[in-house]
Curated annotation (Swiss-Prot):
The lineage of its organism: Eukaryota, Metazoa, Ecdysozoa, Nematoda, Chromadorea. It comes from the Eukaryota. Residues 31-172 form the MATH domain. GO terms for cellular component: cytoplasm; cytosol; nucleus. It is found in: Nucleus. The active site is at 202 (nucleophile), 442 (proton acceptor). This is Ubiquitin carboxyl-terminal hydrolase 7. Keywords: Hydrolase, Nucleus, Protease, Thiol protease, Ubl conjugation pathway. SUPFAM superfamilies: Cysteine proteinases, TRAF domain-like. PROSITE patterns: MATH (PS50144), USP_1 (PS00972), USP_2 (PS00973), USP_3 (PS50235). Belongs to the peptidase C19 family. One of its GO terms (biological process) is regulation of protein stability.
Length: 1135
């Protein structure tokens, strides 16, 4: 039984004779061979939990060992000197990975490996047991805890233990390890690099690697003229870039520029396509671009061959043949066991005899041989294995299909001067492998990157590499070839495309391209790109070490006459931005601000990285010098985060100095300032002749004073001051009057400006200290006004509300259902107060447009969310309800956009007498659109029809009469006609699931349509039967469901002809492919198909409920849906 050892078995008995690793072996190779000879085997098996390990070898950069363990079946432990019954002991045999105490622990990792654990036999067959396992850091051993019993192994007749010695061998292969601490260096380990996957572009990466190692193709791409196309859409330039970087770079290459040149967007990179189809489309695109240039014949010379289709008479000298070119050969896999057998079947001739004789013209009917032969073979032969087929269902054929490393196609060819036997010998160059199922999976490529060298030097061996997107690794020949034959039940992985190279063309088309042979124009272009990328990368790295700051000074604050201290848009757009190092200390920031504001000098060069002892000492000396200075300013960090417990209303943002930056501390900016962009307030003294007052963090509060002058009706920021939080406001009245320029005994009224939307009167009757009276920290704004000029209609709070609520609004007319001849009014802009009554604004609009204001509906919407108002909009009283944003802020939103509609009735009827509903209607051109109506709640279906007629674009020849159908919503299994409502049906009796405000919110809809003239009159024995479209399965509905009149006992052929006339936009050729069926109403199951050659007639008893008239079955039209899903879309290169 295959298992992992018990946890205690993972504890290694230290060994002291571990030799150094054999450097002659590739430590990052794919396979390894381990051996362990256990002498004194009987002694080893005499004690439970004895263990021994082999010398380690390195494979994939990880140490591997054999681990042998003695196990007691009965679980008892015995002394070495006691007599034991060894028949109770089992021999455990494991492969161990990455468990060497001499190596540093690697953390989380995973490595998949397969192995054969073998006990050698001196005279006969050895014991071999296979394992495959995904080793990881918590499960490093895998094998057999009961490989075999001691008695069995020691039986002298079997020859496994000779002279008390047992010989263990292990052959294993391992994939590239993965994990956070594993950085696989493909270039170092293989000399090659991979291509990054953009999402599902593994198919493209696979064929691009094959093209790259076909150096004749790479050389042709290098030599192509890039033309004058823009770089973004230049496929030739993008292909050159990919190949150049694969040759010159040391890390995996991006393919984004190539897919952009194809005209693909980011979503296209997540659509997986067929590698064969992509190969053909790309080669065709490049061949087209090569026409008329020196490389015109490059692709045909590489990939094009010719085959002859022939019919040759056996008894007369007559042959008919046709020669066609090919760029790949597609071979069946189903029923074939090998590539040789598939080629044989492809070119095997058949005999035309008896009733199938060939008409040889003048020779009459003759026995003949019909077949295909290759008359010219290309240097690079692409063999497409047809593993994806439709056999009733879409499936992948994963049968075993072998292919050789060397292939001779002489038996499939017509040899002659143009094609000798030497031209038929091919060597396998690449194997493109698909793992997965029909609708998805993963592509990798195996390439023999040493094929040219081994062809030139017979002593050189194959060097197969596995290209798995950005990971490239060495692999064995068996892994590249035999493992991809398919047929394994556990691994749905098999070769899908083979690339063979003609032996006599290897030297010409696989010869390496030295860097010196790359055209200078190509090298120059991409070297300049590389230098530009390096500069941008260095710039980005430096930017990550820097941060942006804005210095807000008192003069900037004093220029603000509106909300808060400073408009945030000015901070971001008008004030110059500075750049500082994140590793700066606060003292260095003070020096920087001093130099910028007072010395007007640039930032001095400081070694922020302390690159050596001298630089570190210089920086320490500079910091001491700066701290000894007396700066006449203070720095504050301005933030917009705050909370106010005394109100629950949502407040607008504000930007205030809230955190003092102390020059004397040894604090770095990256720990003090958390954002990449910060706003710094520079506090000066209000009086240039006075020094900056002291600041005590435990006592003082930084406050700004804003004065409202009723004479000028304007706010002015006078300056800032420090309030002792333990004192009362009245103690500062004379100081505030002096700052404003008022007499010292002037009575003042105080407000706290918490935010633009919240100005709070300070209640001085409560004899509280400032710290208890106001809920503010540093950065508060005290708004001051004179008591004697403050009135109930003119005061600071009233002015702030006026500034906050007065907005500019753009009014745009909207239509529920626009009449064909109706022209919209022009847009206009108007200033309104958000406290205005909505009807007042409607009256002004009515007077401006000369319409009844009672019919003016004003509403708004969030962009992209909805296009029409709901009932709630009609209940709004003030304009404030039109503001859709969570918090109104006139600083951020300079102009609002509001819709209005001119209704055909007074808007107060909507909530009282009418119901808003949305339905579909079918226009004369066949298109279906949405329609919003407001029928009376007590009305009937005829009221809905009459209201809709006002908007319908009637055309000549129509009936002018409407009907209302209940239909299913667009989920495909529900998209059908359920019933036709009578005109006298009360609106209150309609299925309430169809009466709603949003089309997408319900499973059932209503649809209005004009009644065809031939369906106006319904006689006894006639019935309107629903018709649906479906694609193979009755539940896969699509298209527009409709009804058609049928008559009892009429021929079904007449129904078919009537359907043909109704579907007049369908071509005769397409209609001929339609199949007809009857589907059950309830579950949309197939009742039976309709045949038209047996005189079948309509039986109404089968079609409708005779009491209600509700259809019991549907007529189903079975044909291919015109909707092509993205997963099925053909691959296209647009440029």
């Amino acid at each position: 039984m295959q298992c992992s050892p018990d946890p205690e078995d993972l504890l290694i008995v230290p060994t002291h004779d571990i030799p150094s690793y054999d450097e002659s072996l590739d430590p990052f190779g794919p396979e390894g061979h381990l051996s362990l000879d256990i002498d004194c085997f009987s002694k080893f098996m005499s004690r439970s939990d004895n263990r021994i390990m082999s010398k380690p070898i390195i494979v994939r950069g990880i140490p591997w060992r054999i681990l042998a363990i003695c196990r007691n079946q009965q679980g008892s432990r015995h002394s070495m000197n006691s007599r034991v019954n060894r028949s109770n002991f089992n021999f455990g045999f494991f492969l161990q990975c990455n468990n060497d105490e001499l190596l540093q622990k690697r953390g989380m990792w995973r490595c998949y490996g397969t192995a054969v654990l073998e006990v050698l036999n001196a005279d006969g067959p050895s014991i071999q047991k296979k394992i495959h396992h995904s080793f990881h850091n918590t499960e490093v051993d895998w094998g057999f805890s009961n490989y075999d019993q001691y008695d069995t192994l020691c039986n002298p007749k079997d020859g496994y233990v000779v002279n008390d010695t047992i010989k263990l061998r292990c052959r294993f292969t391992a994939d590239v390890p993965t994990g956070a601490n594993y950085m696989w260096d493909s270039k170092r380990h293989t000399g090659c690099i991979g291509l990054r996957n953009q999402g599902a572009t593994c198919y493209m990466n696979s064929i691009l690697q094959s093209f790259y190692f076909t150096t004749g193709f790479r050389r042709a791409v290098y030599n192509m003229d890039v033309g004058t196309e823009p770089n973004e859409s230049n496929i030739v330039l993008a292909m050159q870039r990919v190949f150049y970087e694969l040759q010159m770079a040391s890390e995996a290459v991006e393919t984004n520029s190539l897919t952009r040149a194809f005209g693909w967007d980011k979503l296209d990179a997540f659509n997986q396509h067929d590698v064969q189809e992509f190969c053909r489309v790309l080669l065709d695109n490049l061949e087209t671009k090569m026409k008329g240039t020196s490389e015109e014949k490059s692709i045909p010379n590489l990939f094009r061959g010719n085959m002859k289709s022939y019919i040759k008479c056996l008894d007369v000298d007559y042959e008919s043949s046709r020669t066609e070119s090919f760029y790949d050969v597609q071979l069946n896999v189903l029923g074939m066991d090998s590539l040789e057998r598939a080629f044989e079947a492809y070119t095997t001739s058949e005999i035309l005899d008896d009733e199938n004789k060939y008409d040889a013209g003048d020779h009459g009917l003759q026995r003949a041989e019909k077949g295909v032969k290759f008359v010219e073979l290309p240097p690079i032969l692409h063999v497409q294995l047809m593993r994806f087929q439709y056999c009733g269902v879409e499936q992948k054929i994963n049968e075993r299909f072998s292919f050789p490393e060397k292939m001779n196609l002489a038996s499939c060819c017509e040899l002659g001067p143009m094609l000798t036997e030497e031209d038929c010998v091919y060597s396998l160059h690449a194997v493109l492998v698909h793992s997965g199922e029909f609708h998805g999976g993963h592509y990798v490529t195996y390439i023999n990157v040493n094929l040219h060298e081994s062809a030139v030097d017979p002593t050189s061996s194959a060097k197969w590499c596995k290209f798995d997107d950005d990971v490239v690794s060495r692999t064995t020949t068996d892994d590249a070839i035999v493992s991809n034959f398919g047929g394994e039940k556990t691994m749905n992985s098999s070769a899908y495309m083979l690339v063979y190279v003609r032996d006599n063309a290897i030297d010409q088309f696989l010869a390496p391209i030295p860097d010196s042979q790359i055209p200078q124009s190509v090298s120059r272009t991409f070297e300049m790109e590389r230098l530009h990328r390096n500069r941008e990368k260095k710039k980005l790295e430096e930017e990550q070490l820097c941060m942006g700051i804005v210095l807000v000074t008192p003069d900037i604050v004093a220029s603000n006459h509106s909300f808060d201290l400073v408009d945030q848009s000015i901070v971001h757009d008008s004030i110059p931005h500075e750049t500082v190092w994140k590793h700066m200390f606060t003292a260095e920031l003070y020096q920087f601000v001093h130099d910028r504001l007072f010395e007007k000098s640039a930032m001095q060069k400081i070694d922020m990285f302390d690159s050596d002892d001298e630089a570190r000492q210089a920086r320490r000396d500079n910091l001491r010098r700066i701290k000894s200075k007396k700066f006449n300013f203070r720095l504050w960090r301005m933030t917009d985060s705050y909370s106010l417990e005394r109100t629950t209303q949502k407040l607008t943002s504000r930007l205030r100095p809230s955190e003092f930056i102390d020059c004397k501390t040894d604090t770095r900016l990256d720990t003090l300032l958390s954002q990449d962009f910060e706003t710094i307030y520079v506090e000066f003294s209000n009086n240039i002749e006075r020094p900056l007052c002291e600041y005590d963090t435990a006592r003082d509060l930084l406050f700004f004073v804003k004065y409202y002058d009723t004479m000028t009706d304007k706010f002015t920021i006078i300056g800032h001051t420090m309030f002792d939080c333990h004192k009362r406001f009245n103690l500062y009245r004379s100081m505030l009057c002096e700052m404003i320029g008022l007499p010292a005994d002037t009575e003042l009224k105080y407000y706290m400006e918490h935010a633009a939307s919240y100005l709070e009167l300070v209640d001085l009757t409560q004899n509280y200290s400032i710290g208890r009276l106001v809920e503010e920290q540093d950065g508060g704004i005290l708004v001051v006004e004179k008591v004697e000029t403050s009135t109930s209609t003119q005061n600071a709070k009233q002015k702030m509300n006026e500034l906050f609520l007065d907005v500019e609004v753009e009014f745009v007319q909207s239509f529920y259902n626009k009449k064909p001849e109706e022209e919209p009014f022009e847009q206009f802009v108007k200033r309104i107060c958000l406290d205005d009554k909505l009807f007042t604004v409607a009256e002004e609009i009515g007077a401006r447009l000369n319409v009844d204001p009672k019919k003016v509906l004003i509403w708004t919407r969030v962009s992209g969310s909805r296009f029409e108002p709901f009932f709630d909009d009609y209940m709004l009283n003030t304009c404030k309800g039109l503001m859709t944003r969570p918090v109104h802020d006139p600083r951020a939103y300079k102009r609002y956009r509001v819709q209005y509609a001119i209704m055909p009735f007074d808007i107060d009827e909507i909530s009282k007498h009418r119901i808003q509903t949305k339905l579909f209607w079918q226009l004369p051109n066949g298109h279906v659109e949405e329609l919003t109506l407001f029928p009376l709640k007590e009305g009937t279906v005829i009221d809905i029809i009459n209201e809709a007629k006002r908007y319908y674009p009637f055309v000549e020849g129509g009936s002018g009469k409407f009907r209302l159908l209940q239909i299913g919503a667009p989920p495909l299994s529900n998209q059908r006609v359920y019933q036709i409502y009578g005109e006298n049906t009360l609106i209150s009796d309609l299925d309430q699931r169809t009466m709603y405000k949003l089309v997408s919110s319900q499973a059932l809809h209503c649809r209005l349509e004009e009644v065809p003239i031939d369906e106006l009159d319904m006689s006894p024995g006639e019935f309107l039967c629903p018709v649906v479209h479906f694609d193979r399965e009755p539940t896969k509905l699509f298209g527009l469901s409709f009804v058609i009149k049928i008559r009892n006992n009429e021929l079904m052929t007449e129904v078919r002809d009537r359907l043909r006339r109704k579907l007049n936009d369908v071509s005769d050729a397409d209609f001929a492919k339609y199949k007809f069926a009857l589907l059950s109403r309830d579950k949309l199951q197939l009742c039976r198909t309709i045949e038209f050659n047996n005189g079948e007639k309509v039986n109404l008893a089968d079609m409708a409920n005779q009491t209600t008239g509700v259809p019991q079955v549907y007529i189903g039209l079975d044909h291919k849906s015109p909707i092509q899903h993205s997963s099925e879309a053909a691959i296209r290169i647009l440029n």
